[in-house]
């Protein structure tokens, strides 16, 4: 069925994904982006509709094809987000803010607010987005990204990896506790925050790199987080999460409940 959910892929190895069929394009007026750099990047490369509004099937197909995300994990996290943030009548979800492109509101208790909706998919203490309390929980924050770079230089030798993730996750929680009187880190945010921390070094590193004691370079991190852009000639990773030492764990991907923040 055109636009329907594709079956689990037979091939789950690395392959070129920044290809001629998926060129990066700059945002057009009205295009929607949100707190998730992974989905933002997939939309800017045409794996998702470039306007940022998609069906759950399109999102699942995109993250499986573009990032080699575990199929069962992709189904779980996408429908989890769609049930709370999407329009179940039109079967459309905004990867950013509320928009009439998803159709008319159906009334309470439905939110239909898109992934920007606070304390559902999106949450406090993001690595590169400000807390909801401060007014913008979805736009790239250069100050926070500078801290991301600082911690990557200090603890990762210029790369973002598992070691950096632990230090930075603790720092962002401490910052939110100290500055945000409405700080909320209850479920599901407790789980998505730590999944968010692991996604960049698992899926934003070229899949042809079989030994990766370094992790995600700052040049490529800037492309994904700020520009929603894959590096030139980028190959997706092997199926499953990549650990700090470069060993693939095919059973870990279902635990990734977010595509990075």
From Swiss-Prot:
Its cofactor is heme b. Heme binds at residue 36. Optimum pH is 5.0 with ABTS as substrate. Optimum pH is 6.0 with dimethoxyphenol as substrate. Optimum pH is 8.0 with benzyl alcohol as substrate, and there is another optimum at pH 4.5. Optimum pH is 6.0 with naphthalene as substrate. Optimum pH is 7.0 with pyridine as substrate. Optimum pH is 7.5 with veratryl alcohol as substrate, and there is another optimum at pH 4.5. Glycans are attached at residues 100, 137, 141, 220. InterPro entries: Chloroperoxidase (IPR000028), Chloroperoxidase-like_sf (IPR036851). PANTHER family: HEME HALOPEROXIDASE FAMILY PROFILE DOMAIN-CONTAINING PROTEIN (PTHR33577:SF16), STERIGMATOCYSTIN BIOSYNTHESIS PEROXIDASE STCC-RELATED (PTHR33577). This is Aromatic peroxygenase. The gene is APO.
